[in-house]
Amino acid sequence: MKILILLVAFVAAANAVSLYELVKEEWNAFKLQHRKNYDSETEERIRLKIYVQNKHKIAKHNQRFDLGQEKYRLRVNKYADLLHEEFVQTVNGFNRTDSKKSLKGVRIEEPVTFIEPANVEVPTTVDWRKKGAVTPVKDQGHCGSCWSFSATGALEGQHFRKTGKLVSLSEQNLVDCSGKYGNNGCNGGMMDYAFQYIKDNGGIDTEKSYPYEAIDDTCHFNPKAVGATDKGYVDIPQGDEEALKKALATVGPVSIAIDASHESFQFYSEGVYYEPQCDSENLDHGVLAVGYGTSEEGEDYWLVKNSWGTTWGDQGYVKMARNRDNHCGVATCASYPLV
């Protein structure tokens, strides 16, 4: 009996050691892949604990996915060592505030209202990437500048449609220079305010001439390096998914804002994203709608480009549920620049 007890204890200890070694191996690989460095051993222990907890949540969700209880899969990514509250405060920077009244010396013009094209049969699927109107996925880093990436993406698409040339535009130009228009750099902003700044400023510099830094810096716009201009902006009727669909089909990529405040979005990997807790009014993240379609399982979706690099989501993209009561607010604050 004593021998049996000793054997059980030995096996339990061996399994514990093996599990610990496995976690450490995965942790070390995670740090290497995502270039993680911590200020102290104490911080690393805390980050490891958060990482393990997030892995557990992801595994439980994916079990439900395998059972057909979820429509999308999650995956460990570079944000796996962050508390969800940290993550949201760091990267979600869409500020839906009516700051027009408090702006001094700057006039934010009223948007042009989108008029749906008459007698036009829109296709069942659209993907502006295939038409060459979308630049590669970018990475905003630890800066709440999502709004600037959404704005440049929409203008890049409109500029391409007008000129046939795809030019990557400078988010840093918007972060540094559009403050008096109501934007707050790494602390958030709005795409419409960015479009207004670009119009009044006479353009926005190219990404090459004004590279991204992921910090608030001094404005050094160069009029000789302008990559695109706009004449104002068009707002899609609030909450109208059908109007958003027609705009995507006939105009090009559209700036949208969504509720990305959920852990499920932090670790999204593939599939059609539907989060029951999503809000259609409390929006916190600016992204770019570049198309729409229907999955093999019959789920309608919006094809959305994010600005968290290619290691997040499906190579940097997410399929958001479509025709589900304006899910996550995809059509609540949709707009595009006039060129």
From Swiss-Prot:
Something else known: Negative correlation between cathepsin L-like peptidase transcription and titers of dengue virus type 2 is observed in infected mosquitoes.
Annotated source species: Aedes aegypti (Yellowfever mosquito)
Pro-peptide positions on chain: 17-121
GO BP term (any one): proteolysis
Cell membrane keyword on record: no
Entry keyword annotation includes Repeat: no
EC number of the protein: 3.4.22.15
Enzyme class: hydrolase
Reactions accelerated catalytically: Specificity close to that of papain. As compared to cathepsin B, cathepsin L exhibits higher activity toward protein substrates, but has little activity on Z-Arg-Arg-NHMec, and no peptidyl-dipeptidase activity
Tissue: Salivary gland. Midgut.
Residues the record marks as carrying a glycan: N95
pH dependence: Optimum pH is 5.0.
Name this protein carries in UniProt: Cathepsin L-like peptidase
Active site: C146, H285, N306
Disulfide cross-links: C143-C186, C177-C219, C278-C328
Xref: PROSITE patterns: THIOL_PROTEASE_ASN, THIOL_PROTEASE_CYS, THIOL_PROTEASE_HIS
Pfam families per the UniProt record, alphabetical: Inhibitor_I29 (PF08246), Peptidase_C1 (PF00112)
Description of how the protein assembles with itself and partners: Dimer of a heavy and a light chain linked by disulfide bonds. Interacts with cystatin; the interaction results in inhibition of cathepsin L-like peptidase activity.
Family recorded in the similarity comment: Belongs to the peptidase C1 family.
